[in-house]
C-alpha cells in the first residue's frame, strides 16, 4: 500500500512539474512610432500563446529611430526580433554583425513585411498654408518638420518620397530632384532623431507648418485628445510604398533559447487577428480583406517603390544616406 501511495505521489509531482508554465521573455527592438501598435500586438500574442501552450510570454520593447536601433543591435543590444522601418537597417545587422542570414527576407511572406505604410503631410487645422502637394513644401516662409535621415527610417522614406515626386514629375530628372530636395531641406528648422520626436516637435512644441509623417503617426496625432481640432492630414498626389520589415535575430534567440516563441511571434503578425490590430493602428495590412474593410482609412494614391525608382535599399542608402552621399551634400544646418 505504501508503495502504491509513493508511486502515485511521484507521478503527481512529475505531472505538476510538467504542467508548470514556462516564463519566456522576448525583446523586440523596433523603430520609433510603433509603441501603440506593439502594445496591442504583444497583449494579443501573449494571450494566444498562453492558450495554446500554457506558457507565459512577456515581450519587452525598445524604441528609437530605425537607423539608431540597427546600430544598437550591431553594438550588442540583445534583440530576439527586430521590427524596423526599412530593409537596409536589418541588412546592416546581417552584414556587419552576422546575427542573421543575408537572405532573412525570404523567411516570411511579402519580403518579411506584414504591413506597409506611406508618407503623408500633417498640417495645422484649416491648412493655413494651403498645402496640397509636394511643391507646396518649398513655399517661401513655410517650415517643414521631418527627422534626421541619418538616424530615422521614416525620414529616409520621406526624403525618397519627395525625390521620387520630383524625378517622376513631367520634365523631371535626377538633377531636378536633387535641387527640389535641397530646397525642401532649407525649410526644415530642426532634425529630430526619430519620428516620434518630430511629431512632438510639431504637435506639442508648436514648431513648423507641415510634418512629414508616417501615415499611422499622422492618424495617431488626430486621435489624441483634441488632435482633430488642431490638425488635419493631407495626402499628396503621390508618395512612396514604405515596407517596414521584421526579422528573427538568429544568434540571439539561439543563446536565449527563445527561437520557437520568437518565430511564432513574427508569424502571428500575418494572422487575421494581428492584421486587424495593425489596421486599427493605421498600418496598411497585407490581408486584402482586412485592408478593404478599413479602406476609408487608407486612401488609394499612387505609391512609388524603392526598387523601381532607386534600385533597392542598398543602392539608395549608398547614394543618398552614406557619409558624403547626396543628403550630406544638400543639407547645411542653419542655412
Give residue spans per PLM region.
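Short helix-loop capping/hinge motifs at secondary-structure junctions, enriched
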Residues: 126-132, 151, 164-172, 252-260
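Bacterial N-terminal signal peptides
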Residues: 6-16
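Ligand-binding pocket segment of bilobal, Venus flytrap-like solute-binding proteins
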Residues: 169-236
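Extracellular/periplasmic juxtamembrane helices and adjacent flexible linkers that interface
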Residues: 253-335
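Short beta-strand->loop
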Residues: 29-31, 123-125, 143-170, 185-188, ...
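Sec/Tat signal peptide C-region and signal peptidase I cleavage site
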Residues: 17-21
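Periplasmic-binding protein-like
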Residues: 113-117, 178-185, 192-193, 225-259, ...
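N-terminal segment of the mature folded domain
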Residues: 22-152, 295, 331-332
Amino acid at each position: 500500500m505504501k508503495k502504491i501511495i509513493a508511486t502515485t505521489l511521484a507521478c503527481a509531482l512529475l505531472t505538476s512539474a510538467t504542467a508548470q508554465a514556462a516564463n519566456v521573455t522576448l525583446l523586440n527592438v523596433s523603430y520609433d512610432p510603433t509603441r501603440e501598435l506593439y502594445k496591442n500586438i504583444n497583449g494579443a500574442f501573449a494571450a494566444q500563446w498562453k492558450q495554446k501552450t500554457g506558457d507565459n510570454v512577456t515581450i519587452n520593447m525598445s524604441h528609437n529611430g530605425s537607423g539608431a536601433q540597427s546600430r544598437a543591435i550591431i553594438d550588442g543590444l540583445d534583440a530576439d526580433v527586430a521590427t524596423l522601418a526599412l530593409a537596409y537597417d536589418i541588412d546592416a545587422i546581417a552584414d556587419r554583425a552576422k546575427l542573421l542570414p543575408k537572405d532573412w527576407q525570404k523567411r516570411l511572406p511579402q519580403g518579411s513585411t506584414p504591413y506597409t505604410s506611406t508618407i503623408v503631410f500633417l498640417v495645422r487645422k484649416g491648412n493655413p498654408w494651403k498645402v496640397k502637394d509636394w511643391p507646396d513644401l518649398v513655399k517661401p516662409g513655410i517650415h517643414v518638420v521631418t527627422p534626421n535621415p541619418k538616424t530615422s527610417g521614416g525620414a529616409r522614406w520621406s526624403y525618397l518620397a519627395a525625390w521620387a515626386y520630383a524625378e517622376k514629375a513631367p520634365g523631371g530628372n535626377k538633377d531636378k530632384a536633387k535641387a527640389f530636395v535641397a530646397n525642401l531641406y532649407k525649410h526644415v528648422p530642426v532634425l529630430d532623431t526619430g519620428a516620434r520626436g518630430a511629431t512632438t516637435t510639431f504637435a506639442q512644441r508648436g514648431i513648423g507648418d507641415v510634418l512629414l509623417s508616417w501615415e499611422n503617426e499622422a492618424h495617431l496625432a488626430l486621435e489624441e485628445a483634441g488632435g482633430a481640432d488642431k490638425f488635419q492630414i493631407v495626402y499628396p498626389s503621390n508618395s512612396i510604398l514604405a515596407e517596414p520589415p521584421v526579422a528573427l535575430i538568429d544568434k540571439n534567440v539561439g543563446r536565449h533559447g527563445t527561437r520557437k516563441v520568437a518565430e511564432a511571434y513574427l508569424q502571428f503578425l500575418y494572422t487575421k487577428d494581428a492584421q486587424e490590430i495593425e489596421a486599427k493602428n493605421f498600418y496598411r495590412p497585407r490581408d486584402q480583406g482586412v485592408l478593404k474593410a478599413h479602406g476609408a482609412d487608407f486612401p488609394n494614391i499612387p505609391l512609388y517603390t524603392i526598387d523601381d525608382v532607386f534600385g533597392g535599399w542598398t543602392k539608395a542608402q549608398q547614394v543618398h544616406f552614406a557619409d558624403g552621399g547626396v543628403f550630406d551634400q544638400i543639407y547645411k544646418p542653419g542655412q
